[in-house]
Amino acid sequence: MTYKEARVYLDEMSKYGSVLGLDTIRGLLRELGNPQDDLKFIHIAGTNGKGSVLAYTSTILSEAGYRTGRYVSPTVISYLERIQIDGTWIPEDEFAELTENVKEAIARMEAAGEESPTVFEAETAIAFLYFKKKKCDLVVLESGLGGILDATNIIGAPVCAAFATISVDHLGVIGDSLEEIAQNKAGIIKPGCAVVSAKQKENVREILKKTAEEKGCPFTEAQSEQMMIFEDSYHGITFSYKEYEKMHSPLAGQCQRENLATALEVIRCLNRQGYRITEAQVREGLSKTRWTGRFTCLSESPLFFVDGAHNEDAALKLKVTVERYFSDYKKIFIMGVFKDKEYEKITSILCPLAESIYTVSLPNKERTLPAEKLAEVVKKHCQKVKAEQTIETAVEDARKEAMTQGKDIAQKTVILACGSLSYLGEVQRIVLNNRQ
């Protein structure tokens, strides 16, 4: 099987959608020899920030000499970035080889009359096979949807179950209220693991803490209010947190304080369990952390950022970030959203900040809110709105507007592409190609 054939096979599987539950992936992994049983995991759930917590944690662990696997979704730049070891994506030939192994296992399941796995379950199995093959010391595992019935929750007790900020998202899928969503995500807590959580709303905190207590797990809450900030700009954050003094993270944004505190509590938790991660390794790991699509600067002239905020909580944090860093800048937005997200709330929070907005349709034609319909919604909050035919023309028009008034004006103008992670990889390719 070639890489292209592997992608075609998995793309065909994706047409059948996703189903929550562990029975099918349990059967698939049984056919593959249960590779997950030979791995140690840090399992991360949450609504906003889990990718950043994963990026900080895994980069620090790699810097400390631990061979560290990463499993993430959704991806921004490349399909292959979902499976990484020490920051390097799985090679195409190895991905193809492992996909063929999974395909053969699925064929055996179907021949026995068992239900066929979903594409996410197949991808999760491929990741576990790869991490076992490469003898990873630790795997930092991001849950896909929710917690208790997500395919990633097929693992046994992780070394640490970590929670980024939990808020309302995927209503009706993993819960009909914030409390139900929190209870679902708390399902990754298993007897024998340590639990670390970002600062949560009180009702969410109580659910996580109670679940940890019921399962005999120590519970630690990150204390971002104890973080001392020395510098906070769009170039990153310099801070001290507990014993970690004068650290620098190149990831900027209001949300990163909570994510940093959470990741550092995960590292402290690992040190308590016998892992050895020094302050110098933490410092170096943080400074090397990169995470595309999370308030990422693509260009300095004009300033061009991308951010994947796609729900109310993330939009509120992005608003604070934009107001803090760019209060006296002209703001030009590019925006694309999924029709099944809280786009009315997102636009009402973010769009009043902008002087002009270019709306786009997202690559996923089934889920996108068309650019024309999004423009109608956006016009309630911003007078200058244009629905674009393509993402490329949106980027071109935004850059032209930023540069029309001369270089001095352009230096006080910022462009922000936001609303969904799904199109930011294309935005990045367009912007970086224009810089060359």
Question: Which residues make up each language-model segment?
Answer:
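Glycine/aspartate-rich loop-and-adjacent alpha/beta segment that forms the canonical ThDP
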Residues: 420-436
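Nucleotide phosphate-binding/pyrophosphate-handling subdomain across enzymes
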Residues: 133, 138-141, 149-162, 166-170, ...
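Short functional linear segments
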Residues: 1-46, 52-66, 70-71, 107-115
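ATP-dependent carboxylate-amine ligase catalytic core
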Residues: 29, 34-37, 63-156
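Hydrophobic alpha-helical packing residues
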Residues: 57-62, 131, 350, 378
